[in-house]
Amino acid sequence: EMSASLVGSEMCIRDSLSQVETVRADLNMNPLGVPESVTKAIADNMSQLSVYPDHNTKKLKEAISAYSGAKTDDIIVGGSSYEFVKILCEFTSPKKAILITPGAQNYEKLLSMNGCEIIYYSTPEEEDFTLDIADFISKLSEDIDIIFISNPNGTTSQIIDAESLEFIAKICDGNNITMVVDEEYMDFVDDLESNSAIPLTSEYENVIVLRNTTKFFAVPGLRLAYMITSNPVLKKTLEITGLPFAIGKLVEAAGVAMFTDEKYIAESRELIRTERNLVYSALSTHKSIKLYKPAANFILIRILRDAISAGDVVDYCMPKGLYIRSCADIGGLDNKYIRFCFMNPKQDDLLVNTVLEIV
């Protein structure tokens, strides 16, 4: 009898645990999950596993071109933005780089490993972390070799408009500086055509745009990214080295499927736009937090109450199955900042209410 009741209580515990749905609002990924078109494309192309990859990836480049507006000839396909930056470091051998902080910077290590000096340009909290274009441009002296701009910013969710980017591109062009714009979150932006730096790549050979599929198409396990450049020397160099990061057949098939899945793309943008507005207005009436107006699919929040830290909020949310990100370890921020991404309406209600209970 005892064992029966133990089994019973164990079942109860398991039931109550399974009722707490895990909401990964810390990963900044599309809440719609992997597109069905991608799963289908992979299943349909299993026979391609025994076929060598095609260095040209023509179909995929055409799909990316139609999706992004980049010229097919300017698109280089690879596994991750990190790989592209590694190649750029080898290609440009930079001695001095500027990184904007706070900002998602996965490249410090690569630059340092290549003996590059890093100059951090801080955007002030008082200005809501917006980039002062005139001041930033004044720092772009001829001894700078490369600059990285995360747009929208991977930490603050702020966006730099295309006009400002063009100002920066002009100065970089005049001073022979490579300008790398990481558009990891650009797919989530409302008016991405008029905010993206892609049109600048055909005008300026020194402007390079990086994008990947991890966040918007929710496929971190796939590894597919692309670089856009019109620089003939860089393109030739990559050709000669035989594109060491050519992608496999299954990844190519998945890529073609996602970039042509107009329904998924439109639904994702609509959901994020709606939820971004709702979450922002639900939180904006509360005096105990400060918000930074988000352009991407996540929001940065500053906790104003002395007694509460980012860790406290994370710990409070976790037993409820809600995962949010403390920004204590991000350069330019401290333990008063949290960040979470927009999920589906039900999950966002829960996120907003739970965060407001503690802050």
Residue ranges and their predicted role:
Residues T57-A97, G103:
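Phosphate-binding glycine-rich loop
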Residues E90-I149:
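PLP-dependent aminotransferase-like
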Residues I272-R273, H286-K320:
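Conserved PLP-binding catalytic core of the aspartate aminotransferase-like
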Residues Q19-V51, L250:
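Glycine-rich phosphate-binding segment of PLP-dependent enzymes
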Residues G33-V38, N56, N206-T285, I289-Y292:
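PLP-dependent aminotransferase class I/II
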Residues E127-V189:
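Active-site phosphate-binding strand-loop segment of PLP-dependent enzymes
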Residues P319-K320, G331-V359:
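PLP-dependent enzyme catalytic core of the Aspartate aminotransferase-like
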Residues E1-G8, C12-I13:
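Single conserved hydrophobic/aromatic residue that forms the stacking wall/gate
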